[in-house]
UniProtKB/Swiss-Prot annotation:
Modification ADP-ribosylserine occurs at: S150
Protein name per Swiss-Prot or TrEMBL: Histone H1.4
Modified-residue entries (N6-methyllysine), positions: K26
Modified residues (Citrulline): R54
Single Gene Ontology BP annotation: nucleosome assembly
Segments of this protein annotated with the region Disordered: 1-41, 92-219
GO molecular function (one): chromatin DNA binding
Phylogenetic lineage: Eukaryota, Metazoa, Chordata, Craniata, Vertebrata
Biased composition (Basic residues): 20-35, 119-140, 149-160, 168-185, 192-219
Low complexity biased stretches: 1-15
Modification type Phosphoserine: residues: S2, S36, S187
Gene of this entry: H1-4
InterPro entries per the UniProt record, alphabetical: H1/H5 (IPR005819), Histone_H1/H5_H15 (IPR005818), WH-like_DNA-bd_sf (IPR036388), WH_DNA-bd_sf (IPR036390)
Modified residues (Phosphothreonine): T18, T146
Positions of modified residues (N6-acetyllysine): K17, K26
């Protein structure tokens, strides 16, 4: 009994190791297949770019070009069609004739130039990040611009003195108006003072009458 017990667990141990080896072989085989050549989309774009036909490259002509490049067209026929559809949807290829994978295809010049532009944009974006930091500095300048707001507030205070000055000016005309009536009563007072001067000759008459009384006394 003791001899048979260790033999039973020893049997499943190699059974567990074998699937690990199979998985490793499958992953190595998949890696070899992927590394065997470039993807279908790159081969299609190269074949379409190499053609000089203005109307575009047909599917049959494209397959011939791929076969000449050493690509197995018969086995990968479905991949070629899927690659064409994906390139058309992305905009790298333009379908001039037909629908789907069948028809004629032409390289999109805008997309070809656009592929080179993103690289330049990335380099430009890295440079643009530094000016972004410089753009933050003007924000500090906006903080310095806040005194302008306070400067705008001060004129409001200046307006109040101006209004007060206007009020004082408005008050001063009242004083001037009051001064005019004061001068007016003075002039009649002078006129009254002139009248008594004219009345003095009247008082001289009684003085002339006094000698008459003296003459009467002498009598």
């Amino acid at each position: 009994m003791s001899e048979t017990a260790p033999a039973a667990p020893a049997a499943p141990a190699p059974a567990e190791k074998t699937p690990v080896k199979k998985k490793a072989r499958k992953s190595a085989g998949a890696a070899k297949r992927k590394a065997s050549g470039p993807p279908v989309s790159e081969l299609i774009t190269k074949a379409v770019a190499a053609s000089k036909e203005r109307s575009g490259v047909s599917l049959a002509a494209l397959k011939k070009a791929l076969a000449a490049a050493g690509y197995d067209v018969e086995k990968n026929n479905s991949r070629i069609k899927l690659g064409l559809k994906s390139l058309v949807s992305k905009g790298t290829l333009v379908q001039t004739k037909g629908t789907g994978a069948s028809g004629s295809f032409k390289l999109n010049k805008k997309a070809a130039s656009g592929e080179a532009k993103p690289k330049a944009k990335k380099a430009g974006a890295a440079k643009a990040k530094k000016p972004a930091g410089a753009a933050k500095k003007p924000k500090k300048a906006t903080g310095a611009a806040t005194p302008k707001k306070s400067a705008k507030k001060t004129p409001k205070k200046a307006k109040k003195p101006a209004a007060a000055a206007g009020a004082k000016k408005a008050k001063s005309p009242k004083k001037a108006k009051a001064a005019k009536p004061k001068k007016a009563p003075k002039s009649p007072a002078k006129a009254k003072a002139v009248k008594p001067k004219a009345a003095k000759p009247k008082t001289a008459k009684p003085k002339a009458a006094k000698p008459k009384k003296a003459a009467a006394k002498k009598k």
